[in-house]
Amino acid sequence: MKKIKYLVLLLAMTIFASSCSSGGADSTGTSNTENKNYKIGISQFAQHGSLDNCREGFIKGLAESGIVEGENLTVDYQNAEAATANANTIAQNFVGNKVDLIAAIATPSAMSAFNAALDTEIPLVYTAITDPVAAQLATEDGKSTGNVTGTSDILPVEEQLKLMREMLPEAKTIGILYTTSEANSVSMIKLYEELAPKYDFTLVTEGVSATADIPLAADSILEKVDVLTNLTDNTVVSSLPLILDKANAKNIPVFGSEIEQVKIGCLAAKGIDYDQLGVQTGKMAAKILKGEAKASEIPFEAIESPLTYVNAAAGANLGIEIPQTVLDQATESFDTIESK
């Protein structure tokens, strides 16, 4: 009988010790994520090179942090096809499916996801957002406005103006096509308006509300300018091949905002590496998924050093000789124009 009582007591003590050990791990706020499978939703606003690079970089950043698609990560990727209504539906579906995290690529998708997840515990990580403050995703001091964080692709506007002036010393008028409903584009227009006179440029802008407006808007603005420069405007960038064709027909150079635009025929750009921006964002998302930080605790980040890209073939087609000083500072220079 004593032996039986002893065994019962020993079993009870073992169970109690095991329970205490488990509770101790939870109380420290740490957890074993090695065996956890994550489910995330990626909402990309439009299909074009810079956003595609951002998405691919995001997946790489997660993988470098030990969260690998096909192993411990399931990705539900959706493209809004440059339609805000689609972005809203995608975000609502992600919330309904109770994903572990929403990744939003470009401002309209981020704003849709933020609103959809507002009353949930689902964190939002955004990327390719030019102005998180204007999009109400961050405060002026960089802090989050909710369970949200991410990275900004704010354009180096002054550096772009310097590059344009160096390459086109006789140019007087810059044109910008932009989507009136994209907060990121509106913010950049204001910055161009402020800085263009400093480099002896006059600015002409033409707003569109949808992709269908772009052919006529491009025809209109090309009658008024010496050069076009692109923003990270999703609707406009999606139609860049059309814009380039129209500009080339009038022998008007087009400056891009990142590498993919220069590859397909823009003359040059001061911009960022969207693949690297995506990697940076993926690593932020991994910290949140692993419980190492909350989205609300991480200020948004940006890549500070712009890169220089030039396309010598585009210059030759336009009869523009690229200064050696520009070639010397170029991160990459292209001798061909990729098919669009």
What would you call each of these model-derived segments?
Residues I15-S19:
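C-terminal motif of bacterial Sec signal peptides marking the signal peptidase cleavage site
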Residues S21-G23:
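Bacterial signal peptide processing site
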Residues I40, F58, T149-A196, P299-A314:
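An alpha-beta-alpha
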Residues S112, A117-V157, S257-A268:
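Flexible loop/hinge segments that line or gate small-molecule binding clefts
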